[in-house]
Amino acid sequence: MPVLVVNVDHVATLRQQRMGKEPEPVTAAHLAELAGARGIIVHLREDRRHIQDRDVEMIAATLNTRMHLEMAGTPEMREIALRINPHIVCLVPEKREELTTEGGLVVAGREKELAAYLAPIHARGIRSSLFIEADPAQIRAARNVGSEYVELHTGHFADAATQDEMRRERDKIVRGVELARTLGLKVNLGHGLNYTNIYEFKNVSGISEYSIGHSIVSRAVLTGMEKAVAQMAAIIATFSE
């Protein structure tokens, strides 16, 4: 059965608006765990716009489930990953001017570079994932890098303006899941998924994890973190394996 991993970046976004001490993303991570999240995601961006180094360190030290560290493929971030020892490192592209991650990592043509970058991480026993588009060339390239997981970008599906466009994007993702599984990769989905559109994947098999943050944090503002996480976890519990 697929599981829910919760991204707490936007708890930190709210805190950083006032450069204060609350809301505390570490507390949010613990509440998400108590409510049924099977893992916590933090994206430590190079510009530190939301999650800070102390957040990563404290969550890594106190979490009872798994911590996923999203990061750009830079020497600094690799050094942090090797110090923190998260369960999984997920490489994502970054642009300074973007509000959020806008697309998948380009892997095709960079297999040797990315494999070399990840080698010390793998040697430490840390698993890796690549955040990519549901594109056959990128999925095949990801296998050659040696990552155990891919996370397929669902943002274009979530942002679709029409039902036809949404259906096309969904079908592309489903084909991507099937190809990745055929190649021996574990598959996660993430970006823009919410309490409504996630049902489009209810009967899709082969998905290991759903990575969800913004919609859960948005609901948590109104209902509380535990209730928001529990509601999403209950939805995913009905999905195909």
Swiss-Prot record:
Residue numbers marked as site, Transition state stabilizer: E151
Protein name: Pyridoxine 5'-phosphate synthase
Binding residue positions for 3-amino-2-oxopropyl phosphate: N7, R18, G192, G213, H214
Gene3D superfamilies, sorted: Aldolase class I (3.20.20.70)
Listed EC numbers: 2.6.99.2
Signal peptide boundaries: none
Keywords: Cytoplasm, Pyridoxine biosynthesis, Transferase
Catalytic reactions of this protein: 3-amino-2-oxopropyl phosphate + 1-deoxy-D-xylulose 5-phosphate = pyridoxine 5'-phosphate + phosphate + 2 H2O + H(+)
Coiled-coil parts of chain: none
